[in-house]
Amino acid sequence: ICLNVVSSNGVRYLRNNVNTNITKQWECMALAETADEQPESELKASESIVHNAVHFDRGAGLRTNMERHTKEIKKAANYMRGKKKKNEFEQIALGAVDTFFREADEASRNINSKRFDERFDRMEQTNELVHGSYNYHNIIFQGREVVTSNFENAKVGIQIMDLYGFLRKTMEKNGWKQDLGRRMIASYEEKRSLSEEERHLLYTLLLYPEKYWKQCNFYYNGKKSWMSSKSYEKLLRIRGQEEGRIQFLEMIKDVLF
């Protein structure tokens, strides 16, 4: 048994080469009654997925999280500025904070725009589902079929979030190659067209400096007196990619708008 495509029609079950859509917890329980050979742990996990999706907070978390992350960038920067002796990580982080905070602040203001209210409302009305962790670790190719696994983070949300997560991680690993990003968006739209609101939302999500925030937050909540060489290397890589990332964002504007 595999959980496959998530859509507004529910979570598609692929079992014995037969597709079934489930949108409610009781449907998952009914499936369990006809699948004695199915491991109990898998049934409980899938039941939890549907339960969590139906009872999710309907998208408010997206706006709240972005605002909170922006405040955390500022908090970490203020702490680093207050230190008399700064290590290499702190010097690099502070040298880039103005650029990244400006991006974070702009994205935070954009996400709270009224232009997205209707899109969030539609998500709530349709119980639109997202995978929540759509990346190459969770994608399995079976012949001409593509199966998605690991739905632990599935929830009600705007489906563009899955495209954003997949696109951002792919771009990070490929140096923000503009042609690759352009082709990925074009391929997505061959199957599902993006609305005007989704285009603006995708740009806003890509604008937010997610990787920089993660490093600042990890630093602030960790042992500040000890610099992790891995964190330092990640921060250097983030800074080194920023010019290409900015150029990619400019290109995306032309593609999306």
Language-model-detected regions and their locations in the chain:
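ATP-dependent phospho-/nucleotidyl transfer catalytic cores
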Residues: Y13-N19, W26, N52-L129, S231
